[in-house]
Amino acid sequence: MNYLQLPKIDLHCHLDGSVRPQTVIDLAKIQGIDIPSDNVDDIKSLMVAPESCPNLDEYLTRFALPVSVMQTEAALERVSFELFEDAAKENVKYLEVRFGPQLHRKQGLNFEQIIGSVVKGMHRAEALYDIKGNYILSIIKVLPKDDINEVIDAGATFLNKGVVAFDLAASEEPGFCHEYIPYAKYALDKGYRITIHAGEQGVGQNVYDAISLLGAERIGHGIHINNHKDAYELVRAEAVALEACPSSNVQTKAVENIESHPFGDFYRDGLLVTINTDNRTVSDTTMTKELQLAAEKFNLSEQDYFQIYKISVENAFASDEVKQSLLKFIA
């Protein structure tokens, strides 16, 4: 397989984990922000997580630097544009990017400005490149809950014009879904689709709860359903797609190593699995790299890959028109 040339779809990619290191330097200069170095290799080393982190929380420390310079409309628009540009150049045909609007208010932007800026950057890239995209709004679970509905309201203005879904992200505690039932319902009532980070850090029950309590149609990661029979069967029965991120899952110790990742078993058992980057910079990866890793480690043929691509199309939060156009790339 020519991994670079193959058409690709990425349904699980974080904006603040996919910023170009040089852009962090540029934005810091423009905004007069002190950063540890103006050497791109030094900055990259602060943004890329080690191949093996002790846990997810250690991995998440790599986001502080890019977020510090993503506090203006121009910065958000640029970072969004560049992510879509980078993806388009490796034949990603459709990209869903998630980000937490709550993280970008340090210089006084409101949620409409924050969301509008990233959508604008995406639309600029769509006009220049053969790529389509949408945004997912991630609620950061470690932050106060009092402005969650405000985020949902602000995003509703952009629903189906660049924003499509609601997500919960950040470190994963057992039983977290119970606290977010009213917020997920509020988002659903507004017309959002739902995908939830769950089952990344060893808690299969969280996947069960995300589907049964929050209405999740997709699950971010979900790998620990392999030790929770009820969650596994619910994922199958409800045809819930799993957003697998192989490199990231090894880095965060969600799995011990790539050989122990359940992706191949899930695929062969008929679960709806997809291949995604998670964080292009923090995991120092691309869709090309993730596809090659998955193909080689899980013994996927080109036909297998086309089947996974179709699963990604069918479970994308895209319009029917966009889905039809995406299927033409493998016709």
From Swiss-Prot:
<dbReference type="GO" id="GO:0006154">
    <property type="term" value="P:adenosine catabolic process"/>
</dbReference>
<keyword id="KW-0546">Nucleotide metabolism</keyword>
<comment type="function">
    <text>Catalyzes the hydrolytic deamination of adenosine and 2-deoxyadenosine.</text>
</comment>
<keyword id="KW-0378">Hydrolase</keyword>
<feature type="binding site">
    <location>
        <position position="197"/>
    </location>
    <ligand>
        <name>Zn(2+)</name>
    </ligand>
</feature>
<comment type="similarity">
    <text>Belongs to the metallo-dependent hydrolases superfamily. Adenosine and AMP deaminases family. Adenosine deaminase subfamily.</text>
</comment>
<dbReference type="InterPro" id="IPR028893">
    <property type="entry name" value="A_deaminase"/>
</dbReference>
<dbReference type="GO" id="GO:0046936">
    <property type="term" value="F:2'-deoxyadenosine deaminase activity"/>
</dbReference>
<dbReference type="GO" id="GO:0009168">
    <property type="term" value="P:purine ribonucleoside monophosphate biosynthetic process"/>
</dbReference>
<dbReference type="InterPro" id="IPR006330">
    <property type="entry name" value="Ado/ade_deaminase"/>
</dbReference>
<dbReference type="GO" id="GO:0046103">
    <property type="term" value="P:inosine biosynthetic process"/>
</dbReference>
<feature type="binding site">
    <location>
        <position position="16"/>
    </location>
    <ligand>
        <name>substrate</name>
    </ligand>
</feature>
<feature type="binding site">
    <location>
        <position position="12"/>
    </location>
    <ligand>
        <name>Zn(2+)</name>
    </ligand>
</feature>
<feature type="active site" description="Proton donor">
    <location>
        <position position="200"/>
    </location>
</feature>
<dbReference type="GO" id="GO:0043103">
    <property type="term" value="P:hypoxanthine salvage"/>
</dbReference>
<keyword id="KW-0479">Metal-binding</keyword>
<dbReference type="GO" id="GO:0004000">
    <property type="term" value="F:adenosine deaminase activity"/>
</dbReference>
<dbReference type="Pfam" id="PF00962">
    <property type="entry name" value="A_deaminase"/>
</dbReference>
<feature type="binding site">
    <location>
        <position position="14"/>
    </location>
    <ligand>
        <name>Zn(2+)</name>
    </ligand>
</feature>
<feature type="binding site">
    <location>
        <position position="14"/>
    </location>
    <ligand>
        <name>substrate</name>
    </ligand>
</feature>
<feature type="binding site">
    <location>
        <position position="278"/>
    </location>
    <ligand>
        <name>Zn(2+)</name>
    </ligand>
</feature>
<dbReference type="InterPro" id="IPR032466">
    <property type="entry name" value="Metal_Hydrolase"/>
</dbReference>
<keyword id="KW-0862">Zinc</keyword>
<protein>
    <recommendedName>
        <fullName>Adenosine deaminase</fullName>
        <ecNumber>3.5.4.4</ecNumber>
    </recommendedName>
</protein>
<dbReference type="InterPro" id="IPR001365">
    <property type="entry name" value="A_deaminase_dom"/>
</dbReference>
<dbReference type="GO" id="GO:0009117">
    <property type="term" value="P:nucleotide metabolic process"/>
</dbReference>
<feature type="site" description="Important for catalytic activity">
    <location>
        <position position="221"/>
    </location>
</feature>
<dbReference type="GO" id="GO:0005829">
    <property type="term" value="C:cytosol"/>
</dbReference>
<dbReference type="GO" id="GO:0008270">
    <property type="term" value="F:zinc ion binding"/>
</dbReference>
